[in-house]
A protein has these predicted regions:
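The feature captures the catalytic groove of carbohydrate-active enzymes
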Residues: 1-66
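Short alpha-helical patches at coil-to-helix transitions and adjacent helical residues
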Residues: 30-38, 90-93, 147-150
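Well-ordered alpha-helical scaffold segments within catalytic/enzyme domains
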Residues: 1, 36-53, 95-105, 151-165
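Extended glycan-interaction surfaces of carbohydrate-active proteins
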Residues: 3-21, 61-147, 168-193
Length: 193
């Protein structure tokens, strides 16, 4: 099973797809797909090095490096963007430090860009909520925050040692919980809905 998953990771590197957000009319090479391929291959490489993965015909080190090279094609202006041909920002890429990508400078510049560019503000005030992206999709431009993005960004900031900023985001996002502590997918801070 793990060998099969490794082959699927390799097959996905650099290939057009609908991306994490399943954009119907936006098939392209996505940095998030390359990041997930890198993460899967990096974990499989560690599993093999620990002696818990039998014979596998794939050179996992070479495959991981190939995924990292593909990922770096999406870097523009020092931060990872949606893809090599798409300079838009994507909050899912805040998972770079969460997944342990080894380039701290790239992790930090990407997360800080996302927090700046995708923050849902009320006037000039940050609300602690973030758009998953601000580009148009099959339904137009996003109007509300995508709640999981706040948690990703808080975790990423904490991984980068920016715990005060992470806590502020978490404190602000708690208003989105319903009466039993559950969060919806979308949230509009202006109306608390």
């Amino acid at each position: 099973l793990l060998a099969h998953l490794a082959k699927l990771c390799v097959r996905s590197i650099g290939q057009p797809d609908a991306g994490l957000w399943e954009i119907r009319n936006g098939w392209q090479e996505h940095s998030f797909t390359n990041l997930m391929s890198w993460a899967g291959l990096e974990r499989l490489e560690r599993i093999k090095q620990a002696g818990h993965l039998g014979s596998i015909s794939l050179d996992l080190t070479h495959a991981r490096i190939h995924a990292a090279e593909a990922l770096l094609r999406g870097v523009q202006g020092g931060a990872l963007r949606n893809g090599p041909t798409d300079s838009s920002d994507d909050a899912a890429l805040s998972q770079l430090p969460i997944l342990g990508y080894p380039n701290r400078q790239l992790c930090e510049s990407t997360v800080l860009r996302i927090t700046h560019e995708l923050s849902l503000r009320r006037g000039s005030e940050d609300t602690g909520f973030f758009y998953r992206y601000v580009r148009s999709d099959d339904f137009g431009k996003p109007e509300g925050a995508f709640v999981i993005c706040s948690f990703w960004i808080a975790q990423a900031l904490a991984r980068l040692g920016r715990t005060s900023e992470a806590r502020t985001i978490l404190d602000r996002v708690l208003v989105a919980a319903n009466h039993v502590g559950l969060f919806s997918e979308h949230f509009i801070p202006a109306t608390n809905t």
